[in-house]
Swiss-Prot record:
Protein name: Meiotic nuclear division protein 1 homolog
Coiled-coil stretches: 89-146
Superkingdom in the source lineage: Eukaryota
Family annotation (Pfam families): LZ3wCH, Mnd1
Keywords, in A-Z order: Coiled coil, DNA recombination, Nucleus
Main location class: nucleus
Disulfide bonds: none
Family: Belongs to the MND1 family.
Gene expressing this chain: mnd1
Keyword Cell division: no
Length: 221
């Protein structure tokens, strides 16, 4: 009688129970497996029953029902045949994979041979590369605008510029009125003489939303 072993891993249990079956190549009933295998392996009957099911799932142990009883058996040749079948299956799969690779390689080579170099294709490739370069530049530029301090600086510059434009507009308007009252120079003649456009007007403060948009210009009274 073998000494009971404790702490065997599932793989060790399967190996020990398989060894029990292969030691005498006998067909066992459920009761015989649980009692005799328990003595041989040092496992409890419950452990033997659980391990037996794992070996059945692995295809190492065969089982069949005769009458009201289940019988179990496993011969060394079973494992050999199982491994042999797996080798055959994997060999077949490898062969099919190689054939697919060869087939796809031929298709690729055929497509390459059919692809005719032309001036149009060359230009399109150059255009594509240019677009890729532009896209990269735009992305780099967008990263600059992700800097909040830079955005704040731009907003401040815009406000200063608008204030300056409105100051100059005020000065021009005052000078136009002065020339009209002092020298009887009509505003239209004044504008023509100094190249001032008829639509010159004050600028309204800029609205800074999530996406800055210019506000329509309105005339100041």
């Amino acid at each position: 009688m073998a000494t009971r072993r404790k702490g065997m891993s599932p793989e060790e249990k399967k190996e020990k129970l398989k060894e029990f079956f292969h030691s005498n190549s006998t067909i066992y009933s459920s009761k015989d497996v649980e009692s005799e295998a328990s003595k041989y392996t040092g496992m409890t009957q419950v452990q033997c029953k659980e391990t037996l099911q794992m070996l059945i799932d692995d295809g190492v142990v065969n089982t069949d029902k005769m009458g009201s009883s289940n019988f179990y058996w496993s011969f060394p040749s079973f494992e050999f045949d199982s491994k042999k079948d797996k080798i055959i299956e994997q060999t077949k799969l490898l062969s099919e994979t190689k054939e697919r690779i060869q087939s796809e390689t031929k298709k690729i080579e055929q497509l390459k041979s059919e692809r005719v170099e032309s001036e149009t294709r060359t230009k399109n490739l150059e255009k594509l590369q240019t677009l890729k370069d532009d896209n990269k530049s735009f992305k780099e530029e967008l990263l600059l605008y992700a800097d909040s301090s830079l955005i704040d600086d731009k907003k401040r510059d815009i406000k200063i510029a608008i204030a300056a434009v409105n100051r100059y507009t005020d000065n021009i308007s005052s000078l136009r009125q002065f020339c009209d009252s002092k020298y009887n120079i009509r505003p239209s003649d004044f504008d023509t003489s100094f190249g001032i456009k008829p639509d010159m007007d004050y600028l309204e403060e800029y609205n800074f939303n999530d996406t800055p948009q210019p506000v329509n210009k309105k005339k100041r009274k």
